[in-house]
């Protein structure tokens, strides 16, 4: 009786059969068949073991890949947490300084103030406050705006909102472009010609900030970029453009940053400005329903020097700027032209609206997302629906202080 033995089992059986003695009786074929079956079972077990091993190897490779990905994410989160802790430490340190200062004021007030304070003392205090303001704003700058003479369209970009500027505190010719109302990329051009003509070499330098700005109220002053930190209501960042590091930060007091300050520029909650007196902030305030608040900031220490509640409303406003310590607010109807200055605020009281002619801007179809004055070249830098514009100004001397 012959039995067909396929594959490796047949080979093994034939190999063993070569060493067996000749068949002696009829039971030998049954024995061979039995051995063949046992080898088949063994072969199937080995194949199953191999399949299981391959599955384990594949699972281990997948596990290693997932573990590597998770370790990478863990490293990223670790860096983010470390940065957040460093920022928190800075804010805690600043808060501690402010608490110490408030404690000092409280102790001083407790020692000085009393219920028997006379009206004469109040008058004296008001006089001292007025003297402080006059000292703060007492510079050789004595000009007031009389007309917007002309405009020059410098460039066109795809972003309807943004800001562009020169350093208002140095003689540098560099031009900075900050496209969009929420971004962290600054483009630095060597000069105005390089900004206007893309073919001019070298090309712009790209600066990536560690934090994003909010709105279009950024300024460059004395080689520092000042901007409203996105995701916060009232935090101002001072960024060193040369070292590429965050130099300092501050919190504007009161209700700053709680609401947009211009009806026709809803992405801007804090508008920073620079004039001959230095750094300013225009923002909302607590209990000031729809009115702008003007705050003078010491650029070196980011300390608050003084704040004023202005009569200028945010309704129909689109932008504002300061010139020689005077706030000029630009308004338009429904975000369309004509664009005109209808509210002027001077903390010293020397410039009033009745002293000024009708201040109209050359006609533009849409509202401005930013208008900033540069005290170096005495011009306005503006952003209007993607167009970067320069406005030339006509000024005259202020009336003398009474």
From Swiss-Prot:
Q: What start-end ranges are recorded for coiled-coil regions in this protein?
A: 73-135
Q: Which domain of life is it from?
A: Eukaryota
Which residues are in the Olfactomedin-like domain?
140-397
As given in the record, the signal peptide range reads 1-28
Where in or outside the cell?
Secreted
A Gene Ontology biological process in which this protein takes part is: signal transduction
Question: Which residue ranges traverse the bilayer?
Answer: none
The alphabetical list of record keywords is:
Coiled coil, Disulfide bond, Glycoprotein, Secreted, Signal
InterPro entries to which the protein is assigned, alphabetical: Olfac-like_dom (IPR003112), Olfactomedin-like_domain (IPR050605)
Residues bearing glycans: 66, 138, 183
PTM comment: the record says:
Highly N-glycosylated.
Provide one Gene Ontology cellular component: extracellular space
Zinc: present as a keyword of the record?
A: no
Q: Name one Pfam family in it.
A: OLF
- Cysteine disulfide partners in this protein: 141-324
Q: Which PANTHER family match?
A: OLFACTOMEDIN-LIKE PROTEIN 1, OLFACTOMEDIN-RELATED
What protein am I looking at?
A: Olfactomedin-like protein 1
Which source organism does the UniProt entry give?
Rattus norvegicus (Rat)
């Amino acid at each position: 009786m012959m039995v067909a033995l396929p594959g490796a089992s047949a080979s093994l059986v034939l190999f063993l059969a070569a060493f067996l003695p000749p068949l002696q009786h009829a039971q030998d074929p049954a024995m061979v068949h039995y051995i063949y079956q046992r080898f088949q079972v063994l072969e199937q077990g080995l194949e199953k073991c191999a399949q299981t091993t391959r599955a384990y190897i594949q699972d281990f490779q997948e596990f290693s890949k997932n573990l590597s990905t998770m370790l990478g994410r863990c490293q990223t989160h670790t860096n983010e947490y470390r940065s957040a802790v460093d920022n928190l430490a800075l804010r805690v340190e600043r808060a501690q300084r402010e608490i110490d200062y408030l404690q000092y004021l409280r102790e001083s007030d407790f020692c000085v103030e009393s219920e028997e304070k006379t009206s004469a003392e109040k008058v004296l205090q008001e006089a001292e406050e007025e003297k402080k303001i006059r000292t703060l704003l007492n510079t050789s700058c004595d000009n007031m705006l009389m007309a917007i003479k002309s405009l020059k369209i410098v460039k066109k970009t795809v972003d309807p909102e943004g800001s562009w500027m020169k350093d208002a505190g140095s003689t540098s010719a560099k031009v900075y472009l900050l496209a969009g109302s929420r971004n962290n990329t600054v483009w630095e051009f060597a000069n105005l010609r390089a900004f206007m003509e893309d073919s001019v070499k070298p090309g712009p330098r790209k600066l990536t900030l560690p934090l994003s700005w909010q709105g279009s109220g950024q300024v460059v002053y004395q080689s520092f970029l000042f901007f409203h930190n996105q995701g916060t209501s009232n935090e101002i960042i001072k960024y060193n453009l040369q070292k590429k590091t965050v130099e300092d930060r501050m919190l504007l007091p009161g209700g700053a940053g709680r609401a947009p300050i211009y009806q026709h520029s809803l992405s801007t909650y804090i508008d920073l400005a620079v004039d001959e007196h230095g750094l300013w902030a225009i923002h909302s305030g607590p209990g000031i329903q729809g009115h702008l608040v003007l705050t003078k900031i010491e650029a070196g220490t980011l300390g608050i020097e003084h704040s004023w509640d202005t009569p200028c409303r945010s309704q129909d406003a689109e932008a504002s700027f300061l010139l020689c310590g005077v706030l000029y607010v630009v308004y338009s109807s429904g975000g369309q032209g004509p664009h005109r200055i209808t509210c002027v605020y001077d903390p010293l009281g020397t410039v009033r609206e009745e002293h000024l002619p009708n201040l109209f801007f050359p006609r533009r179809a849409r509202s401005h997302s930013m208008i900033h004055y540069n005290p170096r070249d005495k011009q306005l830098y503006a952003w209007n629906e993607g167009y970067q514009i320069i406005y030339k100004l006509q000024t005259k001397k202020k009336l003398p202080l009474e």
